[in-house]
Amino acid sequence: MAKQSAKGSTTTKRQRGKRREKKNVPRGQAHIQSTFNNTIVTITDPNGNVVCWSSAGQNGFKGSRKSTPYAAQIAAENAARKAIENGMRQIEVFVKGPGAGREAAIRSLQAAGLQVTAITDVTPIPHNGCRPPKRRRV
């Protein structure tokens, strides 16, 4: 027979972690990582501390639909909405990766009401590093 717990039937409300307070960050950076499979939008303050983030997979897209420009647009809109709630007005955009959602994400950040001050491509280019995946034969 299982032991009875010492607390009995009285239930107490415990707070699960501290509530996230709103940061007031007027300027920031948007890092768009666009791969062949997904698009991740992370919005940070100028020091690189994460304010909010969103991705195509987080917004309910699964499988090959995550890699579409529409999924990247929805992810960027979601991240921009959260950033505006935290008081953000201007952003610099850093784009990384070869994916389909690059331009769509930048456009939807602008459409959501954030002023884009600069767009920089920070895609890493190997100096003959790892062997790339083999070509697909369909």
From Swiss-Prot:
Polar residues composition bias: residue spans: 1-12
GO molecular function terms noted in the UniProt entry: rRNA binding; structural constituent of ribosome
GO cellular component, as recorded: ribonucleoprotein complex; ribosome
Family note: Belongs to the universal ribosomal protein uS11 family.
HAMAP family membership: Ribosomal_uS11
Protein's GO biological process: translation
Ranges annotated as biased composition (Basic residues): 13-22
Protein's organism: Roseiflexus castenholzii (strain DSM 13941 / HLO8)
Pfam families registered for this protein in UniProt: Ribosomal_S11
Bridged cysteine pairs (disulfide): none
Biological role: Located on the platform of the 30S subunit, it bridges several disparate RNA helices of the 16S rRNA. Forms part of the Shine-Dalgarno cleft in the 70S ribosome.
Subunit structure comment from the entry: Part of the 30S ribosomal subunit. Interacts with proteins S7 and S18. Binds to IF-3.
Name the UniProt record assigns to this protein: Small ribosomal subunit protein uS11
